[in-house]
Amino acid sequence: HRAREYLNGFIQLVEETYRQHVKVEDLAHRLGISVSHLNGTCRELAGQPALQIMHERQLLEAKRLLTYTSMTIYEMSELLGFSDPTNFTRLFRRRVGISPKAFRDRLKAEQ
């Protein structure tokens, strides 16, 4: 029961902060639990660690921005709290399977 409250609180914090450069440690601290407790709770109830949940939210927004805006990759990475566009592009490619540019190009080709 308590674990579910922590997960819900974490997801709410992710929604509030996914455009900021926050760390898992920061969110765990705000919830009043350790990083290992947060990761254990996330793995148990959501099937993935806290950082992956945070990245999934950022990538969801990135896909939305790639689809509906003409923002550059640099602007997007900055908006989503990445310190470097290279880190954003690397994460996007690793999780989505293609680069942000290729994702946008594919969308344009389908229209």
Where are these regions (language model features)?
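Short hydrophobic/aromatic patch on the recognition helix
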Residues: 38, 87-88, 92
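Charge-rich, low-complexity intrinsically disordered segments
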Residues: 21-54, 60
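Polybasic "coupling" helices that flank or enter modular domains
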Residues: 1-19, 29-35
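Basic, amphipathic alpha-helical hairpins
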Residues: 9-23, 42, 46, 63-72, ...
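Key DNA-contact positions within bacterial/archaeal DNA-binding proteins
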Residues: 36, 85-86, 101
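Residues within the alpha-helical elements of helix-turn-helix
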Residues: 30, 79-80, 95
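Terminal helix-turn-helix DNA-binding modules in bacterial transcription factors
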Residues: 44-89, 105-111
